[in-house]
Amino acid sequence: MTYKFSVLTQEQAEIIAFNWHYDGEYSFYDMEADQEDLDEFLNLKDRGNSTFAVTKGNEMVAFLSIRKVTDRIFDIGLGMRPDLTGKGNGIEFLRACIHFIQSVYKSGKITLSVTTFNHRAIKLYRKVGFKDEETFKQNTNGSTFEFLKMVYECK
């Protein structure tokens, strides 16, 4: 079964924001962990039509946010439903995201940033073809965290 991408509705945004809770250190990714991120995610104007619900069958399984950096470079944020993480779904999901971005936006590069403690995600991104670009520190969730910026060169 394939993944389907559709513009995120307000109802779907609220489900993700208030019902998707991750275990342990991954709770960092809970939308409610940072008020500014939560407000932006729930605000239709801020979200625009570049945040997508990702469904498989009739189930919402993930989301994908896309921000245009230049005509050919797009920065993404993505999240999988907590009960589906760590179960081998990542490669297929990430490849579907890349295919969607390339087909809709004609991208040359895709960038993303991930906390350096998220070794599971970093391993996945590298496996699919993302390369490390730089590390940086950012204030979020009430503290300062180190992030790794990664780049995928579209073929």
Describe the residue ranges of each PLM region.
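Acetyl-CoA-dependent GNAT
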Residues: 7-85, 100, 104, 153
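Conserved acetyl-CoA pyrophosphate-binding loop and the N-cap/start of the following alpha-helix
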Residues: 84, 88-97
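Extreme N-terminal starter segment of soluble prokaryotic enzymes
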Residues: 2-3
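Conserved phosphate-binding and hydrolysis motifs of nucleotide-dependent enzymes
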Residues: 58, 62, 90, 129
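Short alpha-helical segment within the catalytic ATP-binding CA
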Residues: 79, 92, 120
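C-terminal "cap" of GNAT-fold acetyltransferases
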Residues: 107-111, 115-122, 127-131, 135-155
